[in-house]
């Protein structure tokens, strides 16, 4: 097609194709990325003018999931896509994080990157295609961008890295890793893992980076060809606004000694975050007043002067803190580079919840609460992936009072959703299977105080809370946030960073795991990337910090409680013949409704015949179980029953061996007069009367399928058989009835 550029690279055995010039021609840059059967249109557009009055780069990334991409029609009454799903929000963050550091720090034009998923191949996840597309679209546009970057996902199967694993390979993988970077450096790492050791994790990251180098070269070639065809724009030469040297000298002369004094006093006197912020704010105001005193003419001639002075003061503050760390090995709160803030752990903090854990590390404090529910409480995921659900959920709340602010509380933002997902991913491999623990599990982390690393505080609080709730997790998990200060060849890696170190440092590297290995990892950086040696040091230092924190957790609660909270529901389970499900449900759900009304329990019936009963009242649960047993029990030939005589005839007695329940008929059979006793019986009434309970043995069925019973043979048996059921543990499930509804039918 004339005026259209298409270029293809084979990645992990599948074609990665970039196309431009056909779609979204008015965007600053537009690329259709195709990988396998997945197609994502990514556009990058910038405003004509910079936004006034801001001191940050206004980048927005939107990830738009269109359900037509997966051949689905949206549910609900409106039948169109609404607010982004959690998966879409996390995918938008995944695109944002590696590209953000590559824009000029002084750039103030609004930049909007939109990734629209238009076709989905389950073997080729669209979020990685979205990162590649964003990089390519930005390279085609006139937006200043120090790219390109590439991205891949990496799995680990039999201890071997697998690039861009398929859906089937992913199900066998012990690692779900996304890596993004330039040709020279890694920019972002995001991972969930099943206790992967540090050396294997590093190997997977570096293997991913090797493939990224090919993708980066491919995008550079794509841009060069697009530029030759007039399908790409030249990048403008931008010059960062700077203070006049005389002004810079004046600012440094006034600001440096004053800021240095406050920062060193904060270190030596170990000020709190609020005290340090208060003193620094006062110091900045004093510096600003001294600098601008009597400078009315200069201010009138250069309206940008106050903003430039403010930026330089912040830069000087950053230089002092970083120099102190690099040259003295001491941090702003007086800690050494590897020192972790004081930790306290508590469990059982809330009296009537199912489990609670309070984790405090310095001024960061997180309370995590566990709630257990029936499997019907699991979350159904309605997105572009295969139909699935999750029974373990973690939600993270960051109220304004946690940082001493007074502002309205809104719906959870992208940051809260991202932090919640990270903490969820860290604990997920340790959650017991449904067979072992038949509950839906919801954790909520309330950040009560924040001075850095609240997401890792949520991981530690989650471990405490789950163990307090009696959830038999496979191993405790802890998390720690690592930081980096890098100036040329000088490198300092910080363990357990606080808010100021996060703001003034070069990296926020969060690592969570058990004593055996990593379960979650997330890296965000602000410089042009880090190399293998830095990453290796950070992982090893994080391991030491994680083990230290795990010891603190285990000193508080060495193992999960043996008993659940008295306020948590108890689970009973029984397996029935799948053909008997209709006997429990009844026409229009009549029977199961009746059971629920009479006992007050919750009942889940699975397609494979497993029935789960949840109740906080043990007696009610047992009653519901007995009702279900009665409704579904078959008479077994050779089994002895204690039955009730329902009527007497000349030729024998009819005996009900499985009683009536909820108005539904029981199961009865005939004891022929010849089977009433070992001796000859002249009259049935001489042996049994209507209403009597007698032992009978099921000896078979007649040609019409009617049950034949024998009292004579039962008298020779020494024991009475019992219906089988088990408590608490149950087998896994493949979906099925949810109380009154079948999930597959109701969707």
From Swiss-Prot:
- Disulfide bond sites: none
Say if the entry is tagged with keyword NAD: no
The entry marks the following residues as binding Mg(2+), namely 502, 508
| Domain of life where this protein originates | Bacteria
Q: What keywords tag this UniProt record?
A: Cytoplasm, Magnesium, Metal-binding, Nucleotidyltransferase, RNA-binding, Transferase
Q: Give the PROSITE patterns listed for this entry.
A: KH_TYPE_1, S1
Residue ranges of domain S1 motif in the record: 638-712
> Per its UniProt entry, what is the enzyme's top EC class, as one word?
transferase
| GO biological process terms, semicolon-separated | mRNA catabolic process; RNA processing
Question: What family is reported?
Answer: Belongs to the polyribonucleotide nucleotidyltransferase family.
From the Swiss-Prot or TrEMBL record, give the protein name: Polyribonucleotide nucleotidyltransferase
> Which species is listed as the source?
Moorella thermoacetica (strain ATCC 39073 / JCM 9320)
């Amino acid at each position: 097609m004339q005026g259209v550029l298409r270029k293809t690279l084979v990645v992990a055995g599948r074609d990665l194709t970039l196309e431009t010039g056909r779609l979204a021609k008015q965007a600053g840059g537009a690329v259709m990325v195709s990988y396998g059967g997945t197609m994502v249109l990514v556009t990058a557009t910038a405003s004509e003018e910079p936004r006034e009055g801001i001191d940050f780069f206004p980048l927005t990334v939107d990830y738009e999931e269109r359900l037509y991409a997966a051949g689905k029609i949206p549910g609900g009454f409106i039948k169109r896509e609404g607010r982004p799903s959690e998966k879409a929000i996390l995918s938008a963050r995944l695109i944002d994080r590696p590209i953000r550091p590559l824009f000029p720090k002084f750039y103030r034009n609004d930049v909007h990157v939109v990734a629209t998923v238009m076709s989905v191949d389950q073997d080729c996840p669209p979020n990685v295609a979205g990162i590649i597309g964003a990089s390519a679209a930005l390279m085609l546009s006139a937006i200043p961008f120090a790219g390109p970057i590439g991205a891949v996902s990496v799995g680990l199967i039999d201890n071997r890295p697998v690039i861009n694993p398929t859906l089937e390979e992913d199900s066998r993988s012990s690692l779900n890793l996304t890596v993004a970077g330039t040709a020279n450096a890694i920019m972002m790492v995001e991972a969930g893992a099943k206790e992967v050791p540090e050396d294997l994790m590093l190997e997977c990251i570096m293997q991913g980076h090797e493939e990224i180098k090919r993708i980066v070269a491919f995008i550079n070639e794509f841009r060069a060809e697009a530029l030759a065809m007039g399908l790409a724009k030249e990048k403008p030469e931008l010059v960062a606004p700077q203070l006049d040297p005389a002004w810079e000298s004046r600012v440094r002369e006034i600001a440096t000694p004053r800021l240095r004094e406050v920062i060193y006093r904060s270190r030596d006197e170990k000020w709190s975050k609020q005290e340090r912020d208060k003193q620094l704010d006062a110091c900045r105001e004093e510096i600003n007043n001294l600098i601008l005193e009597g400078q009315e003419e200069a201010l009138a001639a250069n309206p940008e002067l106050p903003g430039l002075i403010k930026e330089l003061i912040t830069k000087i503050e950053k230089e002092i803190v970083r120099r102190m760390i690099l040259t003295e090995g001491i941090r702003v709160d007086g800690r050494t580079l590897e020192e972790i803030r004081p930790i306290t752990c508590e469990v059982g903090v809330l009296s009537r919840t199912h489990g609670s854990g309070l984790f405090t590390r310095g001024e960061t404090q997180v309370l995590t609460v566990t709630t257990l529910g029936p499997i019907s409480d699991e979350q159904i995921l309605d997105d572009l992936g295969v139909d699935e659900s999750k029974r373990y959920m973690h939600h993270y709340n960051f109220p304004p009072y946690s940082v001493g602010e007074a502002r309205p509380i809104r719906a959870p933002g992208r940051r809260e959703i991202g932090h919640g997902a990270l903490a969820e991913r860290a604990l997920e491999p340790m959650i017991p299977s449904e067979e072992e623990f038949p509950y839906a599990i919801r954790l909520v982390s309330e950040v009560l105080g924040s001075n850095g690393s609240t997401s890792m505080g949520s991981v530690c609080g989650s471990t405490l809370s789950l163990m307090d709730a009696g959830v038999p997790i496979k191993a405790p998990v802890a998390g720690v946030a690592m930081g980096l200060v890098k100036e040329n060849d000088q490198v300092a890696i910080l363990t357990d960073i606080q808010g100021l170190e996060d703001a003034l440092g070069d990296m926020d590297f969060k690592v969570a795991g058990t004593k055996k290995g990593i379960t979650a990892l997330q890296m965000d950086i602000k410089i042009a990337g880090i190399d293998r040696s830095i990453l290796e040091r950070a992982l090893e230092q994080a391991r030491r910090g994680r083990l230290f924190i795990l010891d603190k957790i285990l000193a508080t609660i060495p193992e999960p409680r043996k008993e659940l909270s008295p306020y948590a529901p108890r689970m009973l389970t029984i397996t029935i013949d799948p053909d008997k499900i209709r006997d429990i449900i009844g026409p229009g759900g009549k029977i199961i409704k009746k059971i629920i009304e009479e006992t007050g329990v919750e009942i889940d019936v699975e397609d494979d015949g497993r029935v789960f009963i949840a109740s906080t009242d043990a007696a009610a649960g047992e009653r519901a179980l007995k009702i279900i047993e009665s409704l579904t029990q078959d008479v077994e030939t050779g089994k002895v029953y204690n039955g009730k005589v329902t009527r007497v005839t000349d030729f024998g007695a009819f005996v009900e061996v499985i009683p009536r329940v909820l108005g539904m008929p029981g199961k009865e059979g005939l004891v022929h007069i010849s089977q009433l006793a070992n001796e000859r019986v002249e009259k049935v009434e001489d042996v049994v009367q209507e209403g009597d309970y007698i032992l009978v043995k099921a000896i078979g069925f007649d040609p019409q399928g009617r049950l034949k019973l024998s009292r004579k043979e039962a008298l020779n048996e020494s024991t009475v058989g019992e219906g089988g059921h088990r408590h608490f543990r149950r087998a896994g499930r493949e979906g099925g009835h949810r109380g009154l509804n079948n999930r597959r039918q109701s969707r």
